[in-house]
């Protein structure tokens, strides 16, 4: 191999190695800049160590295996890997030994602690490189990582929040005008309610009082959502100890019957329905929710000195439940059998086969007798009294028995037996009788006006036009007879009115037919007149033509006769 070829190969190998180093480790200018930055960053850290490592100058390592090899310079780059720069005039042998030189450099990435073991490789001087990011800080040898304890109670300057006295603060920014309380107090607290809450928590921790709060000005309401009021709003945690809120069962179980309380069983004023409070001890009773979870709690806690129970008032309280029970309509009591010595009530219907048409008389309601008259002295007709079977119940129509009404046990009185109050005693209010005569009177006045408008000579033939005292009915038969007569008269009036309307319709039809006939006759007469005039003119025209034809025929005949005479003469 000639010297020129050796120089060419040496230059090509060196250039190839430089390209690889630049591709792997960057340019020399960049390495110098990063070297200066690393020197500034590690100056403070290396000052704490006993044997500081100077990184300002490049570290020189000697290869112990080959003393004739020229020294290589190792520099630290930005990525923490040592790069070697070969001395000028290096040949192929030194290029081949670059792999052995890498084994002498020990690169440590991370923290360098004081008294760390020094690694010696192949008898060379070890190199410790401390490479760290700019934002990190070095921890001490005995430093303990301190985090945020979420379970620990909050503190203000080392004093627990519940024990801190707000009066001792020099500045009270929440008192300034325009300050938002939510920036200083959570859960809707203000200064007064926070003091009351701290006092309550203090007493609860000391075990002096469970729910009694010393200050009477504090109003603590327990609600689920934020309502914007200044009262305290807290939520009861699900894992709260229920032993502190025990509600003794003997406080509420006042010997109530758990069955249904019917109105006849009430001996005095109705007692409150405390079924909401008869729960097992150790639970918090919430009206309107379930026993397993607290869905919504409204109201204020009562300052109860007798027991440690929680009384919560919600949508349905016991005072609101009772009026609902009292407002229920009384149950329907079916009437019992009537005694045979008392006339039936007026609204009892007669048998269908014998009942007259139900048309009420003038100014007389059909349901009840007049207010100033006693009931009829004589009994009603036998057909109006319902037959009683052996069981005491009224028999049914057409021989069919009536099923007995099943009275429920308790809460209903037995069927009425014995004497019954007389009917006039039940009908002392005359106001309810005034409505029906007034309505009938208005109807009759309207009918009278219609009759007078239709036919002036028609009058009302009803004998019941007088007041009530003009009708003296001695029995039900006379009443039914008057009903029948009134129905017959009403039917006659209806028939007369229908016949009158029919006559009016027929009269109007005849009038229309007469008018139409008059128009037809006038049209036919005008048509006949027109035809006669046309016929006359036509006849005159024909007469003129015939006269002309006759006149024309006469001279023609004369001429023909003259011609014949001339021919004969010839």
Swiss-Prot record:
<dbReference type="GO" id="GO:0005847">
    <property type="term" value="C:mRNA cleavage and polyadenylation specificity factor complex"/>
</dbReference>
<feature type="compositionally biased region" description="Acidic residues">
    <location>
        <begin position="87"/>
        <end position="104"/>
    </location>
</feature>
<feature type="modified residue" description="Phosphothreonine">
    <location>
        <position position="125"/>
    </location>
</feature>
<dbReference type="InterPro" id="IPR007854">
    <property type="entry name" value="Fip1_dom"/>
</dbReference>
<feature type="region of interest" description="Disordered">
    <location>
        <begin position="371"/>
        <end position="400"/>
    </location>
</feature>
<keyword id="KW-0539">Nucleus</keyword>
<feature type="modified residue" description="Phosphoserine">
    <location>
        <position position="247"/>
    </location>
</feature>
<feature type="compositionally biased region" description="Basic and acidic residues">
    <location>
        <begin position="549"/>
        <end position="562"/>
    </location>
</feature>
<feature type="region of interest" description="Disordered">
    <location>
        <begin position="300"/>
        <end position="328"/>
    </location>
</feature>
<dbReference type="InterPro" id="IPR051187">
    <property type="entry name" value="Pre-mRNA_3'-end_processing_reg"/>
</dbReference>
<protein>
    <recommendedName>
        <fullName>Pre-mRNA 3'-end-processing factor FIP1</fullName>
    </recommendedName>
</protein>
<comment type="function">
    <text>Involved in mRNA processing.</text>
</comment>
<feature type="compositionally biased region" description="Pro residues">
    <location>
        <begin position="371"/>
        <end position="384"/>
    </location>
</feature>
<feature type="compositionally biased region" description="Basic residues">
    <location>
        <begin position="520"/>
        <end position="529"/>
    </location>
</feature>
<keyword id="KW-0597">Phosphoprotein</keyword>
<dbReference type="GO" id="GO:0006397">
    <property type="term" value="P:mRNA processing"/>
</dbReference>
<dbReference type="Pfam" id="PF05182">
    <property type="entry name" value="Fip1"/>
</dbReference>
<feature type="compositionally biased region" description="Low complexity">
    <location>
        <begin position="56"/>
        <end position="77"/>
    </location>
</feature>
<feature type="region of interest" description="Disordered">
    <location>
        <begin position="418"/>
        <end position="570"/>
    </location>
</feature>
<feature type="compositionally biased region" description="Basic and acidic residues">
    <location>
        <begin position="436"/>
        <end position="462"/>
    </location>
</feature>
<feature type="compositionally biased region" description="Basic residues">
    <location>
        <begin position="538"/>
        <end position="548"/>
    </location>
</feature>
<feature type="compositionally biased region" description="Basic and acidic residues">
    <location>
        <begin position="1"/>
        <end position="10"/>
    </location>
</feature>
<feature type="region of interest" description="Disordered">
    <location>
        <begin position="1"/>
        <end position="107"/>
    </location>
</feature>
<feature type="compositionally biased region" description="Basic and acidic residues">
    <location>
        <begin position="476"/>
        <end position="506"/>
    </location>
</feature>
<feature type="compositionally biased region" description="Acidic residues">
    <location>
        <begin position="16"/>
        <end position="38"/>
    </location>
</feature>
<comment type="similarity">
    <text>Belongs to the FIP1 family.</text>
</comment>
<keyword id="KW-0507">mRNA processing</keyword>
